[in-house]
């Protein structure tokens, strides 16, 4: 699946309607947000998506607009918008 689609699926089904693996949901997202493993995967994902840096997550917020779970995970990840 395209990397951008995977990134948009953090913590829940993607806004595009694609479902992501239960394994990632169990290991990457805890009850209070992204777990340590999930944070590393998110960092790797952001780095790959942005061409080498993880300085901005604006694109994922745009893609996941209206998605409370994704927003909560990003807050846990350390960015507040």
Curated annotation (Swiss-Prot):
Tissue specificity remark: Expressed in placenta, heart, lung, liver, pancreas, skeletal muscle and brain.
Coiled-coil positions: none
Main location: cytoplasm
Name this protein carries in UniProt: Putative chemokine-related protein B42
GO cellular component, one term: cytoplasm
Lineage of origin: Eukaryota, Metazoa, Chordata, Craniata, Vertebrata
Residue pairs linked by disulfide bridges in the UniProt entry: 7-73, 8-29, 11-45
Swiss-Prot/TrEMBL keywords: Cytoplasm, Disulfide bond
Subcellular location: Cytoplasm
Superkingdom in the source lineage: Eukaryota
């Amino acid at each position: 699946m395209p990397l951008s689609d995977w990134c948009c699926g953090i913590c829940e089904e993607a806004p595009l309607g694609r479902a992501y693996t239960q394994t990632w949901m169990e290991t990457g997202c805890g009850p209070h947000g992204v777990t340590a493993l999930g944070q590393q995967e998110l960092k790797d994902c952001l780095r790959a998506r942005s061409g080498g840096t993880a300085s901005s997550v604006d694109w994922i917020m745009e893609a996941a607009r209206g998605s409370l779970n994704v927003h909560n995970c990003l807050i846990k990840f350390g960015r507040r918008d």
